UniProtKB/Swiss-Prot annotation:
Protein name: Ferredoxin--NADP reductase
Amino-acid positions noted as binding FAD in the UniProt annotation, renumbered to this chain: 35, 43, 48, 88, 122, 287, 327
Oligomer status and interactors: Homodimer.
Enzyme class: oxidoreductase
Gene Ontology molecular function, alphabetical: ferredoxin-NADP+ reductase activity; flavin adenine dinucleotide binding; NADP binding
Organism: Oenococcus oeni (strain ATCC BAA-331 / PSU-1)
Disulfide bonds: none
Catalytically driven reaction(s): 2 reduced [2Fe-2S]-[ferredoxin] + NADP(+) + H(+) = 2 oxidized [2Fe-2S]-[ferredoxin] + NADPH
Length: 346
């Protein structure tokens, strides 16, 4: 890896980074995809591989795991390098290149950098009530969906009022579970169609406006103590498992130590219409990017990736030309792939 020079280094192997790797390959750019963890897929792989994703064009619905697999198949079509277990511990400018330090020792050079690292590492916002530690140790309190092949006809409770909790509840009723949805308010801050689906399902029990005041693991069930928000009345329910759906907090401590550190707002890097950050040659896409009017969707990230790639080329090789349509790119190698041949030669 040392002394190797790439056209583009993409930091982060979530959906945005994977699609950027594929598009860069279509443009025949020498590309490195760098991922700090042992697996590709980013937040999807870590947090919701079983979740059905509805906002990706061309799919009526696709699980997080299947989407990552499809993206991996795309990247296999092009010539590029992927480095796993490789945390970018420093990024600095050297002459006309960026030096990228990996795991505090190995390094290589890139003509441009695309940050696709999302919001960094994630940890769940945990429930803090009497008995919550014991419930988590017993496995009856979790913060991620279980394997959905094993949950049919189980009784679950999900707590929270945002997209995380509502999405969890929808996945569970879609797999024939009974779900009690606990929220301290009557209204939910989530996709309206998902809330409507829960309201129309006989498998959903709304426990609102209520809050959890205690947890008590029994032999096979978890007893949840609830308190009514308006009048303080206490109620108890028993479930097979409780899932915390308060979302996750992000940490970007390693990124914050880079020598070249673009301007940030909240957890994202401020980008312009070219997806360029405050530092020329460094771009950001997906959840790592923020700009006025942005929608934090996978679909948005997929659109940002080609913009960043094409503008990166314009940065380090302005004579090479601007945006390219897929029909004008070199597909000679791509169409050697059996899966592509079978689709287009039928």
């Amino acid at each position: 890896m040392d002394n190797e020079i790439f056209d583009i280094a993409i930091i982060g192997a979530g959906p945005a980074g994977l699609f950027a790797q594929f598009y860069a390959g279509l443009r025949e750019l020498k590309t490195a995809l760098i991922e700090a963890t042992p697996r590709i897929g980013g937040q999807i792989t870590a947090l919701y591989p079983e979740k059905t994703i509805l906002d990706v064009a061309g799919f009526l619905g696709i699980s997080g795991r299947d989407l990552v697999n499809e993206l991996k198949l795309q990247t296999d079509l092009v010539d590029s390098k992927t480095f796993l277990n490789s945390e970018v511990t420093n990024l600095k400018k050297i002459a006309s290149h960026f030096e990228i330090e990996i795991n505090h020792h190995a390094s290589f050079l890139a003509k441009s950098v695309i940050i696709a690292s999302g919001n960094g590492s994630f940890s769940p916002r945990k429930i803090d009530v009497p008995g919550s530690s014991e419930a988590e140790q017993s496995g009856m309190l979790t913060y991620l969906l279980p394997g959905l092949s094993e949950v049919a006809d189980k009784d679950f409770a999900v707590v929270g009022g945002g997209n995380t909790a509502v999405d969890y509840a929808v996945e569970l009723i879609d797999h024939d579970c009974h779900v009690s949805l606990i929220h301290r308010r009557d209204n939910f801050r989530a996709m309206e169609s998902s809330v409507t689906k829960l309201k129309n399902s006989r498998r959903t029990n709304f426990l609102t406006p209520m809050k959890i005041t205690g947890l008590s693991p029994k032999k096979e069930k978890l007893e949840i103590e609830l308190q009514s928000v308006p009048d303080g009345a206490v109620k108890r329910v028993s479930v097979d498992r409780l899932i915390g759906g308060f979302g996750f907090t992000a940490s970007s401590r390693t990124i914050n130590q880079w020598e070249e550190f673009p301007e940030q707002f909240n957890q994202g890097f401020l980008t312009n219409e070219a997806q360029m950050t405050s530092i020329a040659g460094i771009f950001a896409i997906g959840d790592a990017s923020i700009y006025p009017g942005k929608s934090d969707l996978i679909a948005t990230a997929f659109g940002e990736a080609p913009t960043a790639i094409n503008q990166a080329v314009n940065y380090f090789d302005p004579d090479r030309g601007g945006p390219q349509h897929s029909t004008s790119l070199n597909k000679k190698e791509v169409f050697k792939h059996d899966r592509i041949k079978s689709r287009y030669n039928s």
